[in-house]
Amino acid sequence: MTEYKKVIAHNKKALFQYFIEERLEAGIVLKGSEVRSLRQGKASIEESHAADTGHEVFLYNCHIAEYEKANRFNHATRRPRKLLLHTKEIKKIIGRIRIKGYTLVALSMYFNKKNKVKVELGIAKGKKLHDKRESIKEKDWKRDQSRLIRQK
């Protein structure tokens, strides 16, 4: 089942720095100037993460550039943004990220089929240095394999 997604931003570092154990989709509360800026593709979620504040989940460090035509109605570029999730999902997430070593990272931000902005989140556990080295070796080996196959 392929679903339409127009990707705005992708967090490649998260896949290298974390083991992603579970993925989920969340809506996000945005202002009008933020949506216009996202339509131009001016967003970065490289350092972003999500955290709970009681019964809500917020996305921190997500950079959405200012929309130049918004004048005085512009938004703060790195403000915390509320994520829209069902209560069951929030309780499940809070239970998982309260365990030592787990965090909630933003993997990608995209427009869905109905033109709503969605954020793909991952419940993740941090990699150690030797795990990162291992993933680099695997990536290099796959690249070498594909080169060998193309040469034949």
Swiss-Prot record:
Sorted alphabetically, which InterPro entries does this protein's record hold? Answer: SmpB (IPR023620), SsrA-bd_prot (IPR000037)
Q: Which residues cross the membrane?
A: none
Q: Which GO terms describe its molecular function?
A: RNA binding
The main place the protein resides is cytoplasm
List keywords of the entry alphabetically.
Cytoplasm, RNA-binding
Q: Does the keyword Cytoplasm apply?
A: yes
Task performed by this protein: Required for rescue of stalled ribosomes mediated by trans-translation. Binds to transfer-messenger RNA (tmRNA), required for stable association of tmRNA with ribosomes. tmRNA and SmpB together mimic tRNA shape, replacing the anticodon stem-loop with SmpB. tmRNA is encoded by the ssrA gene; the 2 termini fold to resemble tRNA(Ala) and it encodes a 'tag peptide', a short internal open reading frame. During trans-translation Ala-aminoacylated tmRNA acts like a tRNA, entering the A-site of stalled ribosomes, displacing the stalled mRNA.
Q: In which family does this protein belong, per the annotation?
A: Belongs to the SmpB family.
Recorded protein name is SsrA-binding protein
Query: To which species is this protein native?
Result: Rickettsia peacockii (strain Rustic)
